Amino acid sequence: MKIGILSLVLHTNYGGILQSYALQTVLERLGHEVYVFNREQQYDKTRWKYIPKRFVKRIIGRDVVIFQEARYKKEAPMICQHIWNFRKKYIHEYIIKSFDDIKKMNLDAIIVGSDQVWRPCYFKSQWNVGIENAFLSFTRDWNIKRVAYAASFGVNDWEFSDQETQLVAEAAKLFSAISVREDSGIKLLKEKLNLNSIQVLDPTLLLSRDDYVKLIEKADIGKSSGNLLTYILNPSSKKTTFINEVAKAKGLIPFSVNNSNVKQTAPIEQRIMPSIEKWLQGFNDAKLVVTDSFHACVFSIIFNKPFIVLGNHERGNARFDSLLKLFDLHDNLVVNLDSYSFERILSSRIENKKIEELRIKSIQFLKQFI
């Protein structure tokens, strides 16, 4: 079958890129021709938000925002070069200007997922369309199979307006099957849309550690600079202090797989993002991981590494709760940094049988409905 994957927009998000890569890979191994929808790189996403400020700044001669956008547009190819190279090499992207462009592909099926594709604030801002499109409303009159794989709402609450709820309810009726990433998603779909669904694994968990090690080996990169991997999406002084205390208590050397400096005033060499393979290498080399990222937790599990996850309410705690419950690792979640005992022994060993059972169940879902 010829299949298209609709997720969030691909740019530089490590987890987002790898989950699309993983789902594409699994589907190809099942014998399908697969494409991942993406849009042309947008540099001016803040345009409308800043119109009043821009007008004032133009009048007084300090058009800071416009200059920042122009600078980013110029520098992005260098800052993002390694990540974009991975996408170009491994992901079969189909660039669209609007969802109408998809019709001419003559697809047999579209899979929605994974990632927080059903979180309105993310999907609408990234694709610049209504959330009903995440439920394939634009395919209403198409002869096509519609399936959701590990789609995520990201949170436990229903973030749709009444009008949006009505629109997605109509669109969702056309799906052949729906699976979600979090157990809370099952409840939301039943309560709000009266739809049945099942829980499946994030696509990245459908591939083995060996699959990711092969990517690392192909890239031929050096060892990481430490053994305490830190991957923090929302940095703060409290988190930095916490990481330093963990390193001291465990006798480990912290290292990061973020770019070393995110300030726009920093030299561009310091803002170049590590490659996907370098990011994966970090998990392979780590003895312990500290993160506030969902997919960093996932890859800690894949590489069988102990990890500490710092609760990240802004990005959706439901994802962490569901994942940790699935693998009985809820003790790894830290909500209050001030009360953490640095002598705690963290779980890292997950029975291979448990992962394999969930993997078989998840792949069987794809085999059955695609």
Residue ranges of model-derived segments:
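Active-site anion-handling motifs in enzyme catalytic cores
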Residues: 1-370
